[in-house]
Amino acid sequence: MATTPRPLPGDLLPGDLPPGSATNDDWWRDAVVYQVYPRSFADTDGDGMGDLPGVRDRLGYLSELGVDALWLSPFYTSPQADAGYDVADYRDVDPMFGTLADFDALVADAHALGIRIIVDLVPNHSSDRHPWFQEALRGERRDRYVFRDAPNDWESIFGGPAWTRTEDGQWYLHLFAPEQPDLNWENPEVRAEFRDILRFWLDRGVDGFRVDVAHGMIKADGLPDVGPKEGRQVELLGDERVPYFDQDGVHDIYREWRPILDSYPGGRMAVAEAWVASPERLARYVQPDELHQAFSFDFMMADYHAKSFRAVIEKSLAEAELVGAPTTWVLSNHDKPRHVTRHGGLARARAATLLMLALPGSAYLYNGEELGLPEVLDLPDELRQDPAFKRSGESRDGCRVPLPWTAEPGCGWREPWLPIPEDWRGLSAEAQQDDPGSTLNLYRAALRLRKEHPALGGGTLRWLEAPTLERREDVLALERSPGLAVVLNTGEEPVSLAELGLAGEVLLSSGPQPDPGAVAPDTTIWLQLTPQTP
């Protein structure tokens, strides 16, 4: 199935990025990456689905926002049983989203603006419409997938059994939807195919890959039963007891991929979506000869409380440092409720974001969070498209509602694939553009300062100590050297800067500061410290 990509006429490669962009091979260590969920981002042909030309049209908006790179969720040829995470052709663009020429133009224009492109890679499973699986259903070459004569007790992440019976009586494994059969990564042909897929997109100029279900692919020998347990197996996600995730053999795959990435110029990279049992297990994915980044989902799932945030930050930084990798922070994505809703309101979400953007390492944003969008909780059941909803009653559609661009009815969309709430007109990019206190302009200011301030981005942090902090477990204070303090107040009462032993200029605050000498509740500030005299 190997193919030769056609030459790209005059496209900018990463080594050709313009002055002022992140041009070194380690650009990813402190990059801010913006996740684009293409079907929900921007629509240019009026069919209600976002597309690649829509992303291209909004590159100016993304450049003004200040992001370093875009991560594009799947746009490949797919029957869309799981919103593109069921891939039928890994080397082409689904007509819903455009063409390969549209993709090439997007890459070229993004590179011209100094924005890098990361694409989703889905290696654990393909679509059941993939030519390989169609061959398998005919009884040919079933060794590319996982077939057996009788199922074990494994359950699908989406609910129900992880096995479906074929017409001839065998069963095939699908850890997600039945339309997403698991590939057999013990087969050398599967491994060779994905090495070729990597090269195909690298040759087209992509700067990296987000590896979907990076903890998957390899299963325990013999496919043993999970055994008796309480509740659904999905509740064990990230537990070392699960015989189909986080197996040691998956690291052999990444050690095969790393030399391919390193053989291309410009610092090509890969980031793991790995749900594992601990930061120690996560650090194994970012060893020097494997992947470059792995999302800190512990940070995303932490309770909104200073003590919880600090515990996760300390552990994550310590484990990543042992293998020389940066920590990769994230608060929202296409699989989890938006953090405005998860943390209990916009003020808290803004405070958590300003904390995240002050931490050493890389940060990933999810499209629409810069507008302060909440989770949509009242979508009609008949409009939901998430396969998990059909099998378990749980749905991710609420975080996938299309973005509001204008304050007009429809928010810039004509009959979007999911309805946009009427009150989102006030949250639209147009409505927030000229409002200095808007969430959009908070993100712009934070990303600008992150680029300009020598203390932000890479480096280390130091926890600040004060008697007040011993009494106030709902307050977190840290210093980024040189001279920047970050204070988060998750409590219900203001905290005095003087009591923390801090003095200086507030460069940025996530919310109003009625008392300039204190940090208000549910607020994070970035404070330029006044130099102390000897």
Regions found by a protein language model. Name each.
Residues M1-G504, S509-P534:
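Active-site and adjacent substrate-binding regions of carbohydrate-active enzymes
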